[in-house]
Amino acid sequence: MKGLVIYKGKYGATKQYAMWIGQELRLPVASADRFPVDELPKYDYFILGSSVYIGKLEIRNWLKKNFDLLQNKKILFFQVSASPPEQIEKRESYNKASLPSSILRKIQFYYLPGRMIMRNLSAWDRFMLRMGARLSKDPGEKKAMLTDFDHVKKENILPVIRAIRILKEVNEPETELA
């Protein structure tokens, strides 16, 4: 089976995960913005990665535009967000706000923790975070919105790696030697 990792992110965490996944599985890795879509039919499965920006998946427009080329392929999707992976309902709401149900039901999702380093954000993004923090009534949430964190670790990709290895075992059974 021939696979490809495609990602779209804003500040580097999604790209880092994509590179680690590609390295671990020996797969090519490409930015959604730079990959020639006419090459998509050559692949049997895809690992898509996207960061979340203002409650929406960064890769949403690319995925909607190109889904016809992907829909008969196996798709695993890793979402990278500031929201903790255990906040499944919140993480799922980002998917639902970004993609139609016809796409959602054909994708296997994985939620990976992200990073936020205030000094690396654009002036606009820092402003938006400060405004969001001011509007928050929860003091803990307010503080968290303005505090640097980096939860991007290589071991976070293990569930994605396991899923692909299982997929490949199922679709490429070992042949017995005569």
Residue ranges of predicted features:
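N-terminal beta1-alpha1-beta2 submodule of the flavodoxin-like/Rossmannoid cofactor-binding fold
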Residues: 1-71, 162-178
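FMN-binding flavodoxin-like domain, especially the glycine-rich phosphate-binding loop
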Residues: 45, 55-178
